Amino acid sequence: MQATDFKNKKVMVFGWARSGKAAAQLLTKLGSKVTVVNGGEFDAQDATYRSLLAADVTLIGTDNAETLDSTYDYLIKNPGINYDHPLVQKAEKLNIPILTEVEIALSTFNGRLIAVTGSNGKTTTTSLIRDMLKADGQNVITAGNIGVPVSEVVFDLTREDTLLLELSSFQLLGLPDIQPDIALVTNIFSNHLDYHKTRANYVAAKFRITRHQNANQYLVLNADGQDTEKFKNETEAQVLEFSRTKQHFPVAFSNGNLTLTDEIVMPTKDIKLVGPHNQENILAAVTVANLAGVSKPAIREVLKTFSGVAHRLQYLFTAGDVKYYNDSKATDIEATQTALDSFDCPTIWIGGGLERGDDLERLLPNLKNVKAVIAVGETQQKIVTLAREAGKPVIAVTDVEHAAPVAVQLASPGDVVLLSPAQASWDQYSSFEERGDNFVASLKETLNS
């Protein structure tokens, strides 16, 4: 789409989160006649609310489907709002195009576009790519699912800049025309089926990242993924692959080194990130960085110092020769399996959270290095049962704040303390970030007392 597609058009923005505000502001700059609808009243003291009112934007404090009619040209939907919402269904019935704020923003951008999607590892890999480009002296702005709406940053970019996007499957559904210069799919598992209904729908949403790429553009894929062949066969882009288990790709871990086109970048022991999943993230990031012209010294500089993204198997600190990690983002069993397998030393594991009917016994094979278990949250009793089945000592406490001092007491020099819940946080916290922050604060208070 072009920016001119929105000029003098009637556009409804559905959702008053940060992305909705950014979309409404950008649309006013593009000359659209904007209406914002929200499932609740607006805060009259909100600065964005006041500025949009001054710009003749209509703001309606209800998401009733009756607010939408055939006079609208576009519906801009918050990615988290499901397509079965009555207002969205009405837009479909009226054949009104349903977009996300990312589509509007990209219509105004003419520089290099790198887009990252996948089930796991998106944020860590995107952050690695960003830091590598910056270390190489390139001007790069990161936005999208990583926390910053694209509409907030796009007006400040020029043709010489790189826009690096992390994109969820929800966002990709509202991006009918995206055409990245470099696209990366980290991996695909069966996630968000409550939203997409089937795995096929979820995979199709991910495929949108490459659907309109051409032969001058690149698609980077995980060679170990079950959907890789489908993507390779259906894309028009040039495909590059990476693999943690195979070494015949341009970027590889080989003989104790990270190599790029058979040249040593650095010894693996000098890389700060831990875990097999982070090896995949590194391989993906280096493949993209190399395509983007990043030098080996810049790649090496980042990998020597990058310790991870907050709440994602994040190394916190070492105290009393015990290493502490915050993996609060591990909201599913697969993520915690990966975290537990990242350490070959005695581990104090803190697990549990929202009850969703998951089969936690799948974690049994991953407990071999676990020294003791601390169970929290709604699934506390399931964690206790799991630990006892594995023959591990287990202590049940109410929450991560109480788990932290227990973990400190249980740990000995050479151990790892790992918060990796394997469950969502909403039984006790508003987000995985709040859960992780509270854990870290309790750890620091305990260690400093």
Curated annotation (Swiss-Prot):
Its main location: cytoplasm. GO terms for molecular function: ATP binding; UDP-N-acetylmuramoylalanine-D-glutamate ligase activity. ATP binds at residues 118-124. It catalyses: UDP-N-acetyl-alpha-D-muramoyl-L-alanine + D-glutamate + ATP = UDP-N-acetyl-alpha-D-muramoyl-L-alanyl-D-glutamate + ADP + phosphate + H(+). Gene3D superfamilies: Mur ligase, C-terminal domain, Mur-like, catalytic domain, NAD(P)-binding Rossmann-like Domain. GO terms for biological process: cell division; cell wall organization; peptidoglycan biosynthetic process; regulation of cell shape. One of its GO terms (cellular component) is cytoplasm. It is an enzyme of class 6 (ligase). Its EC number is 6.3.2.9. Keywords: ATP-binding, Cell cycle, Cell division, Cell shape, Cell wall biogenesis/degradation, Cytoplasm, Ligase, Nucleotide-binding, Peptidoglycan synthesis. Pathway: Cell wall biogenesis; peptidoglycan biosynthesis. It holds the Pfam family Mur_ligase_M. It is found in: Cytoplasm. InterPro entries: Mur-like_cat_sf (IPR036565), Mur_ligase_C (IPR004101), Mur_ligase_C_dom_sf (IPR036615), Mur_ligase_cen (IPR013221), MurD (IPR005762). Cell wall formation. Catalyzes the addition of glutamate to the nucleotide precursor UDP-N-acetylmuramoyl-L-alanine (UMA). Belongs to the MurCDEF family. This is UDP-N-acetylmuramoylalanine--D-glutamate ligase. It comes from Leuconostoc mesenteroides subsp. mesenteroides (strain ATCC 8293 / DSM 20343 / BCRC 11652 / CCM 1803 / JCM 6124 / NCDO 523 / NBRC 100496 / NCIMB 8023 / NCTC 12954 / NRRL B-1118 / 37Y). The lineage of its organism: Bacteria, Bacillati, Bacillota, Bacilli, Lactobacillales.
